[in-house]
């Protein structure tokens, strides 16, 4: 359980300040606040840790400037890229990859909330839930694992790109084979 970091009174205060700056805010929103209907909810998440070993192949490009004569006879400088095959390996430990276990809120909204400081995680205690709603997971473990794997694969590909860019000016055709 990750306990709420802001108490209800502070949430109400922050929401009131935020609402004051929104003169076009819907009346229903203002009404909810006035009726003290703001409600905290505990949302379920899956968390994954994984040790990844990956090998990649790619093409690294080196830029160079060449001087040519244009159709009008004037000299023109152009930048060209020479491409070279390259490969490498990546080792990375993914710690606490959080995957929402709820379908009740859109993923992009949950992503905007940001990450959580999981150092604050506490053992389950019913007191944490007193006065709050809590949702049961609606994303099963296999689907969450698939999402976590996609996230890790995307990040491994980005790490491979960055590794190539340490030696080259450009990168293309990255292919990663990972063992997670």
Q: PLM features: residue spans?
A:
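Charged, low-complexity helical/coil segments in non-catalytic cytosolic or luminal regions
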Residues: 2-180
């Amino acid at each position: 359980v990750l306990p709420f970091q802001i108490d209800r009174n502070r949430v109400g205060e922050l929401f009131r300040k935020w609402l004051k700056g929104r003169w076009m805010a819907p009346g229903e929103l203002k009404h909810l606040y006035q009726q003290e209907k703001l409600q905290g909810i505990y949302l379920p998440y899956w968390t994954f840790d994984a040790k990844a070993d990956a090998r990649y192949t790619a093409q690294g490009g080196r830029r160079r400037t060449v001087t040519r004569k244009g159709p009008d006879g004037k000299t023109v400088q152009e930048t060209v890229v020479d491409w070279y095959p390259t490969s490498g390996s990546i080792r990375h430990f993914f710690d606490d990859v959080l995957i929402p276990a709820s379908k009740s809120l859109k993923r992009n909204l949950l992503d905007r909330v940001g990450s959580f400081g999981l150092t604050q995680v506490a053992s389950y205690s019913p007191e944490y839930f007193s006065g709050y709603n809590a949702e049961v997971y609606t994303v099963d473990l296999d689907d969450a694992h698939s999402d976590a794997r996609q996230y890790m694969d995307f990040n491994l590909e980005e790490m491979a790109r960055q590794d190539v860019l340490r030696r080259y000016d450009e990168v293309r055709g990255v292919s990663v084979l990972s063992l997670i």
